[in-house]
Amino acid sequence: MSNIETQAHWENLYQTKGEHEVSWFQESPTISLELIRATGLNTDASIIDIGGGASRLVDALLDEGFSAITVLDLSEKALETSKARLGALNAAKVKWVAADVTAWEPRQLYDVWHDRAAFHFLTDPKDRAAYAERVLRAVPPGGHVIIGTFALDGPERCSGLPVVRYDSAAISKILGPSFDLSESRTHAHKTPMGINQRFQFSRF
């Protein structure tokens, strides 16, 4: 599937399904928040949420007082969903970026790079290498990277697309020696349909 076809797939999905109709929906992004807190950073830290289009993590970060938040997603519709949910006042506090992360050009540095369930859709090694290159360019020494994917015993497909399942060692290998693993967790995510999906989260 080309990048254009992938974008069309996600635009169609967000236009035709409500947030409770997608398997990755979380009312509260508890694990992500715990891992971000574990970095020990203050609320003026810059955070980017990759693939966070319609996620409620941005809501939770604003509630905790974070003031330098960027949300990047391939889908314009997903970003519009979050903007509408937040309301104009809160949405204006966030930088919104509609882009393919593998082709995106970072324009600033981020203290935290967070990704829940975007990276595992990159099935082409070239795309994974491009992703890792963006991480290296966007996260300075001393910065933090948090990546959540389906675990080795997690689903093989999501929303009609194939995924790559990971453990922390595999993600470490892709990111390279610039990032040291600080913490790894497995997590059973219960979908709105009542199905348990095994995730792994790695914090570098």
Q: Where do the language-model regions lie?
A:
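Short catalytic micro-motifs in class I SAM-dependent methyltransferases
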Residues: 117-121
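Class I (Rossmann-like) S-adenosyl-L-methionine-dependent methyltransferase catalytic domain
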Residues: 1-108, 122-138, 143-204
